[in-house]
Curated annotation (Swiss-Prot):
Binds 1 zinc ion per subunit. Residues 1-20 form the signal peptide. This is Zinc metalloproteinase nas-26. Zn(2+) binds at residues 154, 158, 164. It comes from Caenorhabditis elegans. Coiled coil: none annotated. Metalloprotease. Its EC number is 3.4.24.-. The active site is at 155. Disulfide bonds join 103-263, 126-146, 267-286, 289-300, 308-331, 358-378.
Length: 414
């Protein structure tokens, strides 16, 4: 396989990942059109790929300067260098995030000369040396101070060929970059990747056509590489997505891109599924559909089962949906109206621990394309009503072990 790769991840000038050193240095600030709904004054965030000046200059020469390659098969050889049992378990859990959602299988092979190498180093630098397969040992450095499952998954995404979402050539339709607040040494991490390709002499790139997803694992959060964390570096055109960016979860479309590249025919002739709503036969089990979050059933036509959600039909009168009690519940609701109508809704109340990338949140999927991550609210909620693009919305509630609550007002709009 030598087809040129994807449009969802890494900067060409190498970078590091670290736990934010200034998580409590800036209070939550006001944003026009949004209302604060946080239960704390200080937002928490981890900084995906905080630039290390030393690492950038040391490794710049190693950036791939030719065609970007896929791996030869869905079996990816890997090695782990250094670290104790806990570190090695962490690496395997990060890898498993890809295996659980895709056909990829990572095979540990200490003898392979063409493999991903996960290397433990002291410090707060985590980075990938190449985008896509380079045809030799490909090091992913995991610093002891930034070793997290999602960091491993994010950096592995780079090795699989992903660019950052916010570096897509169409990104200006979805986000704005506040250049005056971007650290000078991080500039390359915010350039559109076509500019980076030209700078490094890479000419052949064939982007996979997937819509822009604020909830991609490969998207920086709003204050990434900020000179001052009291201001954003990445501003979504739709401000209600401001805390959706920077998630620690894999998005439905992240996995789909990989499955389209490495195993597009895995279930061909093995099933007669008619998957709806952008779902597709699961390459890990061809008897079921892999569905966007919120949908389930044999063909993605039903609501994803949960002990606390359900189907709700909106009327012409305002109704209210309130979150159930409990810190560990996971709830899915579908609010629908007849074809030709829309759902008008607004988060009327709520309280969550604030974090960029929302670890505890209520998510509302109101777009026509239900594959896209909805807007996740944990720090802010829109002050005005929102109207759905179709005759349904999905409400997803994940407190994730934290104290949280929300109320949603909704009604039918003809």
């Amino acid at each position: 396989m030598t087809s040129s790769l994807v449009l969802i991840l890494a900067p060409l000038a190498l970078v590091a990942i670290g736990e934010a050193a200034f998580g409590n240095s800036s209070k939550i600030f006001e944003i026009p059109g949004l209302e604060v709904m946080a239960s704390d004054k200080y937002p928490h965030f981890t900084t995906i790929e905080t630039v290390s000046r030393t690492k950038v200059h040391r490794h710049r020469r190693e950036v791939i300067a030719g065609q970007i390659y896929d791996w030869n098969s869905y079996e990816i050889p890997f090695q782990i260098w250094g670290g104790d049992y806990n570190f090695q378990s962490l690496i395997r859990r990060g890898i498993r995030m890809w295996e659980d959602s895709t056909c990829l299988r990572f095979k540990e092979n200490q003898q392979s000369r063409d493999a991903i190498r996960y290397v433990l180093e002291k410090g707060d630098s985590c980075f990938t040396e190449y985008i896509g397969r380079n045809g030799g040992h490909q090091d992913i450095i995991i610093g002891s101070e930034c070793a997290e499952e999602y960091v491993v998954a994010h950096e592995t995404g780079h090795a699989l060929g992903f660019w950052h979402t916010h570096q897509r050539p169409d990104r200006d339709r979805h986000i704005s970059i506040n250049w005056k607040n971007v650290m000078e040494e991080a500039t390359a991490s915010f350039m559109p990747f076509r500019s980076m390709l030209q700078a490094f002499g890479i000419r052949q790139v064939s982007p996979r056509r997937v819509p822009y997803d604020y909830g991609s694992l490969m998207h920086y959060h709003a204050v990434a590489h900020a000179v001052k964390v009291s201001d954003f570096t990445i501003v979504p055109k739709e401000l209600k997505y401001v805390t959706t960016m920077g998630t620690e979860k894999m998005a439905f479309l992240d996995a789909k891109v990989i499955n389209d590249i490495y195993c597009p025919n895995a279930c061909q002739g093995r099933n007669h599924l008619n998957c709806l709503a952008g779902g597709y036969p699961d390459p890990n089990n061809c008897n079921v559909c892999r569905c966007p979050e919120g949908l389930g059933g044999p063909d993605c036509g039903r609501l994803q089962p949960s002990p606390c959600g359900g189907e709700i039909h909106a009327s012409d009168q305002w109704q209210t949906l309130s979150s159930p009690s409990g810190r560990d519940v996971h709830c899915y609701w579908r609010i629908s109206v007849p074809e030709g109508s829309r759902v008008r809704f607004r988060l009327s109340d709520g309280e969550f621990p604030c974090s960029y990338g929302c670890q505890s949140y209520v998510e509302i999927k109101h777009k026509l394309d239900v594959r896209l991550t909805g807007f996740r609210s944990c720090c802010y909620r829109p002050k005005e009503d929102t109207v759905s693009e179709s005759n349904q919305i999905f409400v997803i509630y994940h407190p994730n072990g934290r104290t949280a609550r929300f109320s949603l007002r909704f009604r039918r709009q003809a």
